[in-house]
Amino acid sequence: MSPLLLTLLVISLVGTLTAFLLNTFIILGTGRSFFSGAKTNRVNLIHLLIGFTNILMQCVMTTDNISFCFPEFYDSIYRIVTFPIMSFTRFSYWLMAWLCACYCTNITRFNHRIFIFIKKVISNFLPHLLLLSGIASLGLSLVHFYHVMSYSWKDSVEGAFNTSEMSQPDKFFTFPQILFISVDFNFSFIIIVTSLVVTVSSLLTHIWNMNKADSDIKQNIQVHVNAARTMMLLLLLSLAFYISSIFNVTVRYNLENLTSVVCWVLLTMFPTAEGAILIQASPKLRNMLLTWLSDGRLVGCGK
């Protein structure tokens, strides 16, 4: 086993354990209200879906990484896990987009008609938007999977007659195909960037105004600073995820290509990073995790 492959395997296993822990806490912290009959908000619904999606996505990605250790089974495993990886990756990015949109509509206070309309749409039709996002993720992943499998089959047939064909370039698609396959990533990225930029601008403006106010108001400034930091972390994470995803859906994964390896590692660590950001942003989830780490008890998940 090569040092690079061993490193990828260790990163994948550590990331899986960490992602499972963090996202399980997200599910426990937000899911109790769904089963207790209490009223839930839009952000909690998205958090719950993010927790489940991240765990499933991390599992299939780790399975794909482990398959590199068994070359004789890699092709079969690759065909099994490729479609789930595509679907979970797309849906996870849509969930982040709608989460950022909810943060924007909850935090900012604009009176423009367009903003009010968007806020009403998200408030009233969020479950429908999530369902539509899931269907779109499955549909585009199916098209993507078909093209990848067709390319792999053609490559294997040509390679059987001409071994020099096995070293073909890594690119899968033409530019129009890339635009179609990545359309959901592009829309999600636009929603995320727009929402976070508007939210951060609003928070920074509010913090600036609070700094010039009385000392009693300044005591609450840390809450807004923490919120702004969370938005910036989500923006950085979404940018890294977007670049890695676009590269991953358009270029064949190759252990000899450093860019390909880095992008795949970023995708593999996404569930862990997103779970960590969401937990540090929620005092309830953060205290719940710290309590469990200190004495091994899960408390506060029903509060």
Across the structure, where does each feature detected by a protein language model lie?
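Structural signature of the GPCR N-terminal helical module
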Residues: 11-73, 95-105, 229-240
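Extracellular-loop-to-transmembrane junctions of the mid-late helices
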Residues: 15, 139-146, 165-195
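Alpha-helical transmembrane segments of multi-pass membrane proteins
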Residues: 16-20, 46-60, 86, 129-141, ...
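Intracellular signaling interfaces of 7-transmembrane GPCRs
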Residues: 33-43, 108-125, 197-224, 283-303
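Membrane-interface helix-loop-helix junctions at boundaries between adjacent transmembrane segments
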Residues: 78-88, 100-130
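Fourth transmembrane helix
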Residues: 91-95, 121-154, 191
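Seventh transmembrane helix
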Residues: 94-95, 233-239, 247-256, 261-303
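Class A (rhodopsin-like) GPCR signature focused on the TM5-ICL3 interface and adjacent 7TM helical core
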Residues: 97-98, 148, 182-213
